[in-house]
Amino acid sequence: MAILSRLLTTVTLGSLLTSAVAQSSGCGKQPTLTNGVQNINGREYILNIPEGYDSSKQYKLIFGLHWLGGSMNDVVSGNSIEPWYGLESRAEGSAIFVAPNGLNAGWANNGGEDTALMDAIIEAVEADLCIDQSSRFATGFSFGGGMSYALACARASKFRAVSVLSGGVISGCDGGNDPIAYLGIHGINDPVLPIDGGIEMANKFVQNNGCQSADVGRPNSGSGQSVRTDFQGCSRPVSFIAYDGGHEGAPLGVGNPLAPDATWEFFTGA
């Protein structure tokens, strides 16, 4: 019984320490940040704090990254997509959202400058608001997908999962050797960033996560359907959804639940 008691005590203390480590320094503080445009290091981002924010409760932190020619405002308003890629409504107050503005309406990430922006935003937000530091996520379409991929490569230790919508290796991949939960969503007829490139990106994390290799399924062209491939044996989950479509920020049409549902379920299950 004494041994069992010591074991239980060790487990309990370990759980408490893990919880404490995952809790940002902003927990328990009266926040100074407010909803709307924030400035940091000469760059801008839009912050969305849920109504009824409670500084004693830990929130997920979700980055929504815009496409080439888009802006942080487009992510927030839902211009050609659902607002916040459809994730805010699904979060039901459980997440704080950030939409940064890229330079020249994109994410070239020269010298890692956009990765550094995400680092700075994380530091500022978490110093002021209560974030579960084990629950940071990023998603984006096209160039925003490329930047999400770059974060998966360079900041796998900071982010729990990414969802890459019709992305390409266009924001770099510094590092790219560590495991992270990875979801790719791509149109089979994408004329801008072809699906084969998207599959290659996912396969990097199939390898990093120790998954069993598998062929990615694809729907028939003109079917209006999607096919999901969940890789097996992974240390962290890797999935890929191929859908009947092109280069679209809202796969199968604005309001279709495919990408928002898949992304939210993937993030919460990762």
Curated annotation (Swiss-Prot):
Residues 1-22 form the signal peptide. InterPro entries: AB_hydrolase_fold, FaeB/C/D. The lineage of its organism: Eukaryota, Fungi, Dikarya, Ascomycota, Pezizomycotina. The gene is faeC. Its EC number is 3.1.1.73. GO terms for biological process: xylan catabolic process. It comes from Aspergillus terreus (strain NIH 2624 / FGSC A1156). One of its GO terms (molecular function) is feruloyl esterase activity. Its main location: secreted. This is Probable feruloyl esterase C.
